[in-house]
């Protein structure tokens, strides 16, 4: 029967007669909520904790011994100077960039801490930190802060391609990647 066809009075009476001893059912269907999907995102609280932990190393009073002549550079004592040479030549391509333009020193420290924590978490070996020229405050402080951090292996003034003397290429010691354990 199509929707356009009307039922006759006789058909309606027959239907009502057949349904006379029945009662209406109440809705008893349980609607199951779909299971929540687990996100691979790091909780905000953990991100803030990592950022604060990583920026804890940055002191304005500590003055590490950096080369005073030539390009800004630093290599940790247990790291080969060849890594510094590869940084200078641009053999490493930064996978992540941080722009500190317009930030205060406190904000810049927090962002550097967050960058280092993110690099370790995401297994990123090389990063570019653009401090800019400006009033030379961040340009002077950024190398001093980076040299204090134990996870920074080396840094060098970036090649022109990545910002020249307004940026630094940083090598970060990443956590060893282990495949997930199978049950």
From Swiss-Prot:
Keyword Iron-sulfur on entry: no
SMART domains from the UniProt entry: SMR
Protein's GO biological process: rescue of stalled ribosome
UniProt keyword annotations, A-Z: Endonuclease, Hydrolase, Nuclease, RNA-binding, rRNA-binding
Enzyme's top EC category: hydrolase
Stored Pfam families: Smr
Keyword rRNA-binding belongs to the record: yes
Enzyme nomenclature, EC number: 3.1.-.-
Sequence ranges assigned to domain Smr in this UniProt record: 98-173
Gene Ontology MF terms in the entry: RNA endonuclease activity; rRNA binding
Family assignment from sequence similarity: Belongs to the SmrB family.
Function: Acts as a ribosome collision sensor. Detects stalled/collided disomes (pairs of ribosomes where the leading ribosome is stalled and a second ribosome has collided with it) and endonucleolytically cleaves mRNA at the 5' boundary of the stalled ribosome. Stalled/collided disomes form a new interface (primarily via the 30S subunits) that binds SmrB. Cleaved mRNA becomes available for tmRNA ligation, leading to ribosomal subunit dissociation and rescue of stalled ribosomes.
Subunit structure: Associates with collided ribosomes, but not with correctly translating polysomes.
Cited HAMAP family: SmrB
NCBIfam families found in the cross-reference section: PRK04946.1
Name of the protein described by the UniProt record: Ribosome rescue factor SmrB
Organism per entry: Erwinia tasmaniensis (strain DSM 17950 / CFBP 7177 / CIP 109463 / NCPPB 4357 / Et1/99)
């Amino acid at each position: 029967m199509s929707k356009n066809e009307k039922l006759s009075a006789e058909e309606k009476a027959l239907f009502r007669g057949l349904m006379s001893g029945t009662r209406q059912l109440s809705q008893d269907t349980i609607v199951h909520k779909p299971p929540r999907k687990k996100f691979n995102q790091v909780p905000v609280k953990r991100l803030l904790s990592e950022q604060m932990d990583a920026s804890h190393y940055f002191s304005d009073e500590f003055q590490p011994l950096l080369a005073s002549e030539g390009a800004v550079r630093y290599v940790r004592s247990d790291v080969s100077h060849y890594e510094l040479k590869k940084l200078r030549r641009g053999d490493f391509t930064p996978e992540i960039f941080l722009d500190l333009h317009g930030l205060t020193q406190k904000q810049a420290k927090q962002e550097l801490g967050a960058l280092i924590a993110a690099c370790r978490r995401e297994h990123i070996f090389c990063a570019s930190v653009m401090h800019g020229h400006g009033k030379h405050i961040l340009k002077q402080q950024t190398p001093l802060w980076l040299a204090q951090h134990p996870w920074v292996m080396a840094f060098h003034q970036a090649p022109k391609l990545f910002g020249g003397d307004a940026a630094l290429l940083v090598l970060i010691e990443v956590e060893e990647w282990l495949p997930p354990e199978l049950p």
